[in-house]
């Protein structure tokens, strides 16, 4: 069978469906999962990323989980390199890789074999200094002056991506988008299945998920990660849920501040889900399944049908 990728917005049930689909195969083929959720790369970031515990993985090998310390910076280029090596190794063992996750750039960099523009430390440092001196809003305005399309695609609060875009524009003399790949045949001839559901249903699922995260001990998890150096982590400290709890703890960590963190975490997940929907629905290669109108068994059947027919 061809490799499979399961994508879609956060909270839609990608991890569980992947396990159900693999179990339904009943051992006909050997299957291994490759994670494509950027924040699940981090050790200790379990509750807030809805990472499946080892006991819940049903004995199925998982890759790209718990491979970074929270002080390390996650990058698309590094993920692409190591995840691609995992997929090649899985295939070499005669097994089938299943990519599962919703981190948009991570998924596309892997399936479309992106090439990344070079970097110049001196240029990068200069733009980082500008960021520190003038702030992200003014630096984002400078990006808009140089490359309006790039500025429109990058949130005005995202200093790291703004710096990278300015670096690429300066080094290449071309718009940032010129270095992005065009969508073609997916790498390894991967079959891509997308999961989605009505927005109201997903919002309810997200509300339950956030309540569960806080109920299971997200705040204590953040306190533990602070001892591991979370504040020094460029990407880990900005993860949804973790950033909001950090803000609440900095403000004193009382019940009101933690309630605000919970609400902001929920709203952040809703915004992120909208962005994921928009991103993945632009990809004509995705076979979409509605998980809100079909029962779990039916969705598994549909996913298997798509996978087998494509193979």
Swiss-Prot record:
Please cite one Gene Ontology biological process associated with this protein. Answer: tRNA modification
Enzyme class (EC, first level): transferase
Q: Please tell me where ATP binds in this chain.
A: 8-15
Q: Does the keyword ATP-binding apply?
A: yes
Q: Which cofactor does it need?
A: Mg(2+)
- One Pfam family cited in the UniProt record for this chain: IPPT
Gene3D superfamilies xrefs: 1.10.20.140, P-loop containing nucleotide triphosphate hydrolases (3.40.50.300)
Q: Which Gene Ontology MF annotations are present?
A: ATP binding; tRNA dimethylallyltransferase activity
Record: residues binding substrate: 10-15
Q: Where is this site: Interaction with substrate tRNA?
A: 103, 124
Q: Which UniProt keywords apply?
A: ATP-binding, Magnesium, Nucleotide-binding, Transferase, tRNA processing
Could you tell me what reaction this enzyme catalyses? Answer: adenosine(37) in tRNA + dimethylallyl diphosphate = N(6)-dimethylallyladenosine(37) in tRNA + diphosphate
Provide the E.C. number(s) assigned to this enzyme.
2.5.1.75
Instruction: Name the family.
Output: Belongs to the IPP transferase family.
Provide the function of this protein.
Catalyzes the transfer of a dimethylallyl group onto the adenine at position 37 in tRNAs that read codons beginning with uridine, leading to the formation of N6-(dimethylallyl)adenosine (i(6)A).
HAMAP family tied to this protein: IPP_trans
Q: How does it assemble?
A: Monomer.
Q: What is this protein called?
A: tRNA dimethylallyltransferase
Q: Give the organism, scientific name.
A: Mycobacterium leprae (strain TN)
């Amino acid at each position: 069978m061809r490799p499979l990728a399961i994508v879609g917005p956060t909270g839609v049930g990608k991890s569980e469906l992947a396990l159900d689909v693999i179990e339904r195969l009943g051992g006909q083929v050997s299957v291994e999962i490759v994670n494509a959720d950027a924040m699940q790369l981090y050790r200790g970031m379990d509750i807030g990323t809805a990472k499946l515990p080892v006991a819940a993985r049903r004995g199925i090998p998982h890759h790209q989980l718990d491979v970074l310390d929270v002080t390390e910076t996650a990058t698309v280029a590094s993920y692409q390199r190591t995840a691609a090596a995992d997929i090649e190794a899985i295939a070499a063992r005669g097994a089938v890789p299943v990519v599962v996750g919703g981190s948009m750039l991570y998924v596309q960099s892997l399936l479309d074999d992106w090439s990344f523009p070079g970097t110049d430390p001196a240029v990068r440092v200069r733009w980082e200094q500008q960021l520190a001196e003038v702030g992200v809003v003014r630096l984002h305005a400078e990006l808009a002056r140089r490359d309006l399309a790039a500025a429109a695609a990058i949130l005005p609060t995202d200093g790291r991506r703004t710096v990278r875009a300015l670096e690429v524009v300066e080094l290449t003399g071309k718009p940032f988008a010129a270095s992005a790949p065009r969508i073609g045949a997916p790498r390894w001839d991967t079959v891509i299945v997308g999961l989605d559901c009505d927005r109201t249903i997903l919002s309810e699922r997200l509300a339950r998920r956030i309540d569960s995260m806080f109920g299971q001990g997200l705040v204590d998890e953040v306190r533990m990660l602070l001892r591991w150096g979370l504040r020094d982590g460029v990407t880990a400290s900005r993860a949804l849920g973790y950033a909001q709890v950090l803000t609440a703890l900095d403000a004193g960590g009382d019940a009101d501040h933690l309630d605000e963190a919970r609400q902001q975490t929920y709203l952040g997940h809703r915004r992120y889900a909208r962005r994921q929907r928009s991103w993945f629905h632009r990809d004509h290669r995705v076979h979409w399944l509605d998980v809100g109108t079909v029962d779990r068994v039916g969705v598994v059947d549909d996913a298997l049908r798509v996978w087998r027919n494509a193979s």
